[in-house]
Structure formats: C-alpha cells, structure tokens
C-alpha cells in the first residue's frame, strides 16, 4: 500500500568498492555538485541482445521521441538497427569501434551474471555466451551521464574492487545516475509498443520517459514502480513484485535531466487502478551462467 501515499523523500544509493576511500565518495559529490540539480542530455547510446531487439526498441522509444539517437544508417543492420547496437554482432573485439564515449545517456538490454568473475554485460546466441560490453567502456565515457541497464545483477558491487563491475566502473568515473538490478531481472523478447511492456522492460521505459520529462531521478523511479498498478487491478505477479524490489537507483535522487517541467511532481496512485489491457505474460531471465 506504500504507493497510495505521496513520497516526500526519495533515496539513491552510493556504491563503494571494497577498496574505496573517502576520495571516491568525495569524487562523486564533486561531480554531482557541478550539475546543480540538472544535467544536460543530448545524445543516447543503446545496446541490446538480438533476442530482445523488439522489446528494446519499445523500451527506448523516449530516446527517439526526444531525438537523442544519432541514427547512423550507414552501418550494417546486423550491427545497428532501430537505433540500437545489436549483440552478439557487437562484442568485445569491436565494441570500442561503436561505443559512443560522447553520449550522456546509456541503455543496455543485455545479460548479466552472478558469477564472481563475470563483470561485463553479455549476449547469448545458440547457447553460446559473448561479452558485449565491459566495465572499461563505461569508464571511458567522456561526459556526465545516466546509465540504465536491464541485465541480471547489473547493480552488483559488494565485495568488488574499484572499476571491477559495470556499476563501480560507471559510478567511479563520469556516471551520475545508474539504474540496475541487484539480482535476477525479468523481461520479454517481443513487444509491439510501450503499452505491452512488463517487468524490467516497463520499469526502465517509464523511468527514462519520466526523467526526460523533467522529473528528478527519485521521482522518476518512484513513478516507474507506481506504473505497475495500472494493470491487474493493482495486484502484482511474482515477477512484477521482484522487479519493484530488486531494481535500485544509484546516485543523487534529486538530479534531473534537462529543464525541469513546470509543475512536474510525482503523485500517489490508487491501489485499485483500472486495468488498461493485457501485457506480455512471457518472461525471460536476463542472466547467463
């Protein structure tokens, strides 16, 4: 029933490596202070597993609506289609050639893993696993940025050193906001529009849309979780409930992207919301083993 009430305080986590020092905390605070309440966003980079291309195109629709994709159609469609880079065609050996270091918003719909030495994001094809993007790429970003990932364990950081996971590499360098799951994430491979998204796909789509509408990161995350009340008369499936509790916002929850829209504010939602229609009931794990 928490979403019946207005949330006056929004929280974000600050992940610290096991070998972190006060300088790491101070470094993030200095970078956040340079973006006093707002950071400009002008270019987005998206990368997806081939299996999830349809869903990823729907999730990333807010980028197209705000004209944030570069749209380089000269690339082979096996590598780049629907404004997204596609893995496993884009994998470790070539990702440096396409990864946009000058972007300020990154979206990844790839696999993750809880294996201690598996710290990248991965693509899966014919029962083979391919390293799609590594912590080194995120650490090479040149501008203050936002990262959103649907990967399983995309938000893992405990017992790792500086830069050893995607989260620590990003937040230890130029990333100010990071949204990711601490455990298994669930999503679907097919989608015809944002209306039929569910689980991690819906959460990330709404979060990115609300950020780009001018809400703070904390408000956008709260509203993304609220959105699950739009279906099934306010009752959750097990996967929806897991999505709500396992995704975490890292960074300053009071930061917002671009110009804050007049009157933008998160409001409480009635628990018994009218169902708007069926959602995609097929769910898949976003993990590799």
Predicted regions and their residues:
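Cysteine-dependent hydrolase recognition
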Residues: 1-289
